[in-house]
């Protein structure tokens, strides 16, 4: 039954009932869901065949046990019958055999005194007539002496019991009878108590069987209760451990949430710095674009003046590069005033050469001042023109934040799994170390007990040696040895005793 239950649980674990052909969802050819895999089907068939085989073996074993019990019962009955046959064989030599139970009443005529021969003949005739009447071969009045059927109260009955055995034989037992007075004059048999005793024995046997059955059931229930109690204790311990683990996980989650907030704050600071830098760069670009527009307008004015005037006059006075640079430095302070001074009304009266010099100096100043912009080297095309749309990709999006949070969650899970693995390894190492410590402790205790036994044996031997030494010394004193030998023996014995005491003193701290 244990194997069948085990295979049933395995079959339920694979998703199919233990005794059925297939799962409910997989039956039928037109099912909507996909069918089971070949490995699952093969395993299911194997489990089904094994369960069927185990059930058959279980039934056969039960039948075999029933047959064995039946044969044992029959054997006991046959042994009892054999004993009864043997006892019957011994009793047949002492008792008469009758075909049925018969009670014979002794009448007044049979009780009269008569001669020995006539009494014996009368008794024989009476017995023959009684047997004939019992067998139904003779009529009631066909004997040599008439039968007396009067049953008077208070007379003596001779009782004969016929016992039938199982082998077909008949056993008779004759009793002396009883004297009993009844209003109807009916005698009562003594052996009527035997069936009641047998019934009492049967009732007692039945009660004993019921008691044994109840005791067996009580033991089974007690074992089940103990198993359930241990299971409940185990589940309570597991629940407590789960609660502790849940509390630890909640603490970890709170700590990780706080760390996540800190990480978000750390990430938001560089993002804000980047936004400010982007805005500053965009403002510089806008200012450069406006400056380029102004320079282009001034260049157009210069070109118009060049076309209207003689070109040779423009480049009349062209000093050296150093002189021109010094002049440009001197004219920097006068730039704003001259720009405002030379309005559209006074353009015709000014020298075009001075205007061109001023414009070139202004361009050079602009070029040397804005090194980061490089406005003169740019070309307005799609590759170099910077607008606000170029910086939209720098802003963090929600998808990027979600990916970062997902990566952080994966990192947290990996860290937790790593910690769990390390915890398991630590637990295994601790268990191994505890086992080794227990083994070492047991070995130390065993060695200590052995050492104590050896010390006790040594003390016993020392006592025996001291006793022998004293006996030898006493015998030597009785033999009256010389004083020198006595002194030497005494000194030797004292030296040995002192050495033994020193050894015991060395051993005692080691034992403690």
Curated annotation (Swiss-Prot):
Bias type Acidic residues, positions: 496-512
SUPFAM superfamilies per UniProt: Intermediate filament protein, coiled coil region
Domain IF rod: 50-479
UniProt feature, compositional bias: Low complexity: 480-492
One Gene Ontology cellular component annotation held by this UniProt entry: intermediate filament
Coiled coil, from the record: none
Pfam families: Filament
Family matches, as InterPro entries: IF_rod_dom
Alphabetical list of SMART domains matching this protein: Filament
Keywords: Coiled coil, Intermediate filament
UniProt-annotated stretches for the region Disordered: 473-512
Protein family per UniProt: Belongs to the intermediate filament family.
Protein name as annotated: Intermediate filament family orphan 2
């Amino acid at each position: 039954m244990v194997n069948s239950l085990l295979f049933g649980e395995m079959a339920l674990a694979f998703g199919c009932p233990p005794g059925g052909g297939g799962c409910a969802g997989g039956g039928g050819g037109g099912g909507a869901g996909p069918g089971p895999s070949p490995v699952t089907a093969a395993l299911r068939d194997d489990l089904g065949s094994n369960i069927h085989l185990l059930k058959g073996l279980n039934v056969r074993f039960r039948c075999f046990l029933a047959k064995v019990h039946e044969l044992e019962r029959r054997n006991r009955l046959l042994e009892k019958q054999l004993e009864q046959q043997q006892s019957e064989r011994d009793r047949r030599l002492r008792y008469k055999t009758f075909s049925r139970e018969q009670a014979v009443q002794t009448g007044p005529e049979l009780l009269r005194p008569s001669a020995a021969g006539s009494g014996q003949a009368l008794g024989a005739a009476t017995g023959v007539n009684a047997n004939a009447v019992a067998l139904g071969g003779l009529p009631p009045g066909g004997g040599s002496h008439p039968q007396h059927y009067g049953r008077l109260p208070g007379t003596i009955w001779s009782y004969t019991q016929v016992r039938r055995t199982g082998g077909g034989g008949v056993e008779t037992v004759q009793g002396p009878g009883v004297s009993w007075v009844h209003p109807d004059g009916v005698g009562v048999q003594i052996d009527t108590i035997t069936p009641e005793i047998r019934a009492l024995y049967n009732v007692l046997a039945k009660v004993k069987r019921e008691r044994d059955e109840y005791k067996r059931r009580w033991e089974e229930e007690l074992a089940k209760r103990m198993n359930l109690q241990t299971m409940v204790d185990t589940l309570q311990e597991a629940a407590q451990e789960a609660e502790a683990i849940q509390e630890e996980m909640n603490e970890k989650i709170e700590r990780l949430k706080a760390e996540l907030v800190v990480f978000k704050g750390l990430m938001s600071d560089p993002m804000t710095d980047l936004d400010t830098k982007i805005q500053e760069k965009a403002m510089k670009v806008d200012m450069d674009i406006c400056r380029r527009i102004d320079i282009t307008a001034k260049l157009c004015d210069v070109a118009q003046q060049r076309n209207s005037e003689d070109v040779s006059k423009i480049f009349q006075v062209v000093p050296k590069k150093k002189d021109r640079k010094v002049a440009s430095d001197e004219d920097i302070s006068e730039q704003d005033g001259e720009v405002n001074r030379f309005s559209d009304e006074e353009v015709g009266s000014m020298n075009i050469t001075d205007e061109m010099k001023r414009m070139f100096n202004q361009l050079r100043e602009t070029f040397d001042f804005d090194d980061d912009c490089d406005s003169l080297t740019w070309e307005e095309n799609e590759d170099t023109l910077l607008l606000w749309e170029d910086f939209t990709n720098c802003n963090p999006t929600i998808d990027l934040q979600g990916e970062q949070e997902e990566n952080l969650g994966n990192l947290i899970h990996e860290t937790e799994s790593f910690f769990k693995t390390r915890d398991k390894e630590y637990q295994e190492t601790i268990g191994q170390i505890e086992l080794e410590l227990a083994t070492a402790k047991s070995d130390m205790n065993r060695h200590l007990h052995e050492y104590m036994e050896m010390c006790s044996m040594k003390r016993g031997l020392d006592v025996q040696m001291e006793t022998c030494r004293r006996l030898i010394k006493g015998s030597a004193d009785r033999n009256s040895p010389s004083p020198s030998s006595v002194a030497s023996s005494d000194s030797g014995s004292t030296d040995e005793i002192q050495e033994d005491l020193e050894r015991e003193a060395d051993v005692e701290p080691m034992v403690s």
